[in-house]
Swiss-Prot record:
The lineage of its organism: Bacteria, Bacillati, Bacillota, Clostridia, Eubacteriales. One of its GO terms (biological process) is translation. HAMAP family: Ribosomal_uS11. It comes from the Bacteria. GO terms for cellular component: ribonucleoprotein complex; ribosome. One of its GO terms (molecular function) is structural constituent of ribosome. Belongs to the universal ribosomal protein uS11 family. This is Small ribosomal subunit protein uS11.
Amino acid sequence: MAVQKNKKTRRRKEKKNIEHGCAHIKSTFNNSIVTITDVNGNALSWSSAGGLGFKGSRKSTPFAAQMAAETAAKTAMEHGLKSVDVFVKGPGSGREAAIRSLQAAGLEVTLIKDVTPIPHNGCRPPKRRRV
């Protein structure tokens, strides 16, 4: 008697119809992460330089941030996204490149805001590097 396999039914991602959203760009010295959300903060799509196959010091380049923003924008535009508010966080080199590639992908940028956390003299910073 043949044993029958249980077939798992995969649900397809439903296409949300969202016209305006937010793009959160986190650009550090090591990597760049782009998350596109709706106005409430629910993620529509995300992409990172490391997730696209960039390794080591190539993750922190402006080109890697550009590719990450492009990939996130394309998948978000499948949900009907047309315009975004951009929130940039971090001191990395991919900040401007990511914003430019969001515009090049066809999203209308309505606002650019820097939300980098700045301490009001909080924790003691790590000791200086001696190279």
